[in-house]
Amino acid sequence: MAEVLSIDELRERIDVIDNQLVRLLNVRVACAVEIGKLKHELGMPVYQPEREKKVLEKVKQSAQQLAGPLTADAVVRIFERIIDEARRAERESGSTSEDFGPLIGE
């Protein structure tokens, strides 16, 4: 028989997951900022819509394969926001490039 967890236990579990998500999001954005710096050094535009499209397609496919309670479209919307915030972090990191592309969520 499956263990029945209390609301408090489930909330504690969510708190742990939230902390893991925040840590992973910060690692992801730090990587994106570093990529942005390298693109600047190489004279490449920061905003590369084809790469973003590829990322969104990959996460949509992953969401479809995992078939959890979040729809694939919901996962795509979440990642659109993550990409927006990564681009915002690149801007705030002091990159001089003007080509950051549009913010999806604005």
Residue ranges and their predicted role:
Residues M1-E106:
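Domain-level signature for soluble enzymes in the chorismate/prephenate branch of the shikimate pathway
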